C-alpha cells in the first residue's frame, strides 16, 4: 500500500494537471506540485507510524502527478521542431538516469536510518528555486503558432466529436497511448520478474539490481541522440526498437547466464529508450499550442497505468496459458506480444503512430 497508493494517485492528478494547464497558469500548477512534493518529503523524515507515512505518500503522489506533465509540457511551450524533439529526448534521459541514481542513494541512506531515504524527496526544492526563473521568459507564441494546430486529415470529424478534447487529434493520440501502454507493459517484466527468474535459476540475486539499473541506463542513452536516430531510421524508428525489445526479452528467456541476461536488459532498454521520447514528441504534434500539456498528460498517464496493471496482466495471461508461477514464461510471452507489435509497426510504418515525425513542422 505504501508504494502503490502514490502511483494510483499520480494518474488522476496527471490528468487533472493536464486539463488545468489549458486554462490556468502552468507555472502556478508546477510550483504547487513541487511544493507538495517537498512538504511530503520533509514530513516523511519525522513520521512515526505507518498510517501517517501512507498519508504523506498520498500527498507525494498528488504533487508528483501535478509536476510530471508540466515538466515536459513546458519544453513543448518553449521549443519547436527538431530542437524540441532533442530536448524531449534529453528530458527522458535525465528522468531515467535520475531514477538509477536516486535508487542507489536511497539504498545507501537506508543503511544509516530508515527515515533518511526520504531526503531524496527534498530535491524538488532545488527545482522549485530554479523554476522561479521561468517567470522571466515567455514562449514565443508567434513561433508556436506556426505549428499546425491539428493537421488536416480525415480524423477532423473525430476531433469535432470529442467536445472535451478540442484542439487535439484524438485518433492519433489514442494510437500513441496504446503504443506507449503496450511498450511500457512488455518491458516492465524486466523490473518486476527478473529477480524471480534469477532466484529460480540460482543466479546471483544481488546481480538482479545491477541488471535492472543497466536496463534503465540503456533507456537513457537513445534520448541523448534521438534526432540523429530518427533521421537515420526514418520510418523504421518504431518497429526496429520494438524488435530490439523482443530480442532483449528472448535473450533473457533463452540463455540463463548473467552476462546474457545483462545483455538482454541492455538491448530491451535501448529499444524502449527510443520509443519513449518519440511518443512524447508525437503527442505534442497532435495538439495545438494551447493543448500540448494536456496531450502529454494523457499519454503519460498510461505509463503509470501500465505500472499498476503489469503484475495483474502477467498473472492473468500466465494463468490462461497454464504457466502460473513460472519464472521465465512472462519473458517469452511479452516477447511474443512485442513481436506482434513490431509486425503491425512494419505494416503501418508510413502511418503517424509508427512513422517518423516531420521536423519541418
Question: Which ranges hold each PLM region?
Answer:
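Extracytoplasmic gate region of multi-pass secondary transporters
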Residues: 172-213, 219
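A late C-terminal transmembrane helix in Major Facilitator Superfamily
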Residues: 284-323
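Helix-loop-helix hairpin linking two adjacent transmembrane segments in secondary transporters
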Residues: 81-82, 90-136
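Conserved MFS/SLC helix-loop-helix module at the cytosolic interface between two early adjacent transmembrane helices
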Residues: 11-50
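Helix-to-loop junctions at the C-terminal end of transmembrane segments
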Residues: 12-25, 221-234, 318
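Cytoplasmic helix-loop-helix junction between adjacent transmembrane helices
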Residues: 50, 56-97
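Symmetry-related core transmembrane helices of the 12-TM Major Facilitator Superfamily/SLC fold
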Residues: 117-133, 329-347
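Structural signature of the two symmetry-related core transmembrane helices
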Residues: 28-42, 236-251
Amino acid at each position: 500500500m505504501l508504494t502503490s497508493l502514490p502511483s494510483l494517485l499520480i494518474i488522476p492528478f496527471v490528468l487533472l494537471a493536464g486539463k488545468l494547464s489549458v486554462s490556468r497558469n502552468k507555472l502556478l500548477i508546477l510550483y504547487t506540485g513541487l511544493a507538495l512534493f517537498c512538504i511530503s518529503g520533509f514530513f516523511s523524515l519525522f513520521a512515526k507510524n505507518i498510517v501517517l507515512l501512507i498519508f504523506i505518500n498520498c500527498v507525494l503522489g498528488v504533487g508528483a502527478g501535478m509536476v510530471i506533465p508540466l515538466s515536459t509540457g513546458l519544453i513543448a511551450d518553449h521549443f519547436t521542431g527538431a530542437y524540441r524533439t532533442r530536448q524531449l529526448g534529453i528530458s527522458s534521459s535525465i528522468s531515467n538516469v535520475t531514477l538509477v541514481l536516486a535508487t542507489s542513494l536511497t539504498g545507501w541512506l537506508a543503511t544509516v536510518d530508515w527515515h533518511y531515504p526520504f531526503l531524496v524527496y527534498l530535491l524538488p526544492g532545488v527545482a522549485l528555486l530554479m523554476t522561479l526563473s521561468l517567470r522571466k521568459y515567455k514562449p514565443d507564441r508567434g513561433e508556436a503558432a506556426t505549428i499546425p494546430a491539428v493537421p488536416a486529415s480525415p480524423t477532423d470529424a473525430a476531433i469535432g466529436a470529442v467536445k472535451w478534447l478540442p484542439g487535439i487529434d484524438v485518433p492519433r493520440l489514442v494510437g500513441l497511448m496504446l503504443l506507449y501502454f503496450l511498450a511500457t507493459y512488455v518491458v516492465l517484466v524486466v523490473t518486476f520478474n527478473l529477480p524471480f527468474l534469477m532466484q529460480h535459476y540460482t543466479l546471483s540475486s544481488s546481480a538482479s539490481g545491477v541488471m535492472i539499473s543497466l536496463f534503465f541506463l540503456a533507456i537513457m542513452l537513445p534520448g541523448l541522440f534521438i534526432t540523429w536516430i530518427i533521421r537515420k531510421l526514418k520510418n523504421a524508428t518504431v518497429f526496429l526498437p520494438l524488435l530490439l525489445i523482443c530480442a532483449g526479452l528472448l535473450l533473457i528467456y533463452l540463455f540463463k547466464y548473467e552476462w546474457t541476461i545483462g545483455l538482454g536488459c541492455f538491448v530491451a532498454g535501448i529499444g524502449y529508450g527510443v520509443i519513449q521520447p518519440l511518443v512524447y514528441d508525437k503527442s505534442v504534434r497532435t495538439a495545438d499550442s494551447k493543448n500540448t500539456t494536456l496531450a502529454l498528460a494523457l499519454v503519460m498517464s498510461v505509463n503509470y497505468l501500465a505500472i499498476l496493471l503489469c503484475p495483474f496482466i502477467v498473472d492473468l495471461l500466465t494463468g490462461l496459458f497454464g504457466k502460473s508461477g513460472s519464472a521465465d514464461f512472462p519473458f517469452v510471452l511479452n516477447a511474443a506480444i512485442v513481436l506482434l507489435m513490431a509486425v503491425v509497426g512494419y505494416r503501418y510504418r508510413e502511418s503517424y503512430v509508427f512513422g517518423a515525425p516531420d521536423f519541418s513542422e
